[in-house]
């Protein structure tokens, strides 16, 4: 039944919403020849949807093993506060001699959100469904009914004193249409803001440096976060707005321990292959390679 639904989603290019609760495959079902021969088509079919149609994962409760593997293939994961996500449930963990844990202890959102697994954290399943609907709306083109905030407020959005920090999210709210901002991975890579917005009814992806974190410097999590979001926008032909305010990539021994070279370089690799327009706005500063990475690899139009 699942395989047929995935096949139809691919053939008809239908968005997929996956409610992922569950403990994985049941021994009586997964011990048949196909699975023991490592020929379970569901995972390949699910992963093949990536970049082909929007795929949203929703978790409200426990999600382990095979369910979690499919969840990880989703473009965006929405989880409730009581969710627990893990590649193995309590029985598997105990069977492997790794200890005894309650399901809620395996992968709570208290660390699955800051580590980037969960994209959007919500209160309950009802809110999760509402957010999923809002997310999918950005892939359906412009809307006619929109309202812009008072654009005169932008004149005072950035302090004249360059030593004063400001709230980049407030700036984003002024640029975007009212009630059109949907931030992705808010708790992960806090030095970079990634969000879907609308401007005059048209959908855009947005990346922005956060001056409240390292003065806007791009660290490893921020680079990884931006690159993945740029890929998502490019896959579905959503143009990008980049708000640049960075002194560059983070440097120093502590930064190098995080494999920053690999992570931030992904922004150049992704930027070089972008097929959608990228509109760059330098809010205060844009120095070095970090600034170039915010503009798809360079300032050349």
Describe each model-derived feature in a short phrase.
Residues 1-301:
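Ligand-binding clefts of soluble mixed alpha/beta catalytic domains
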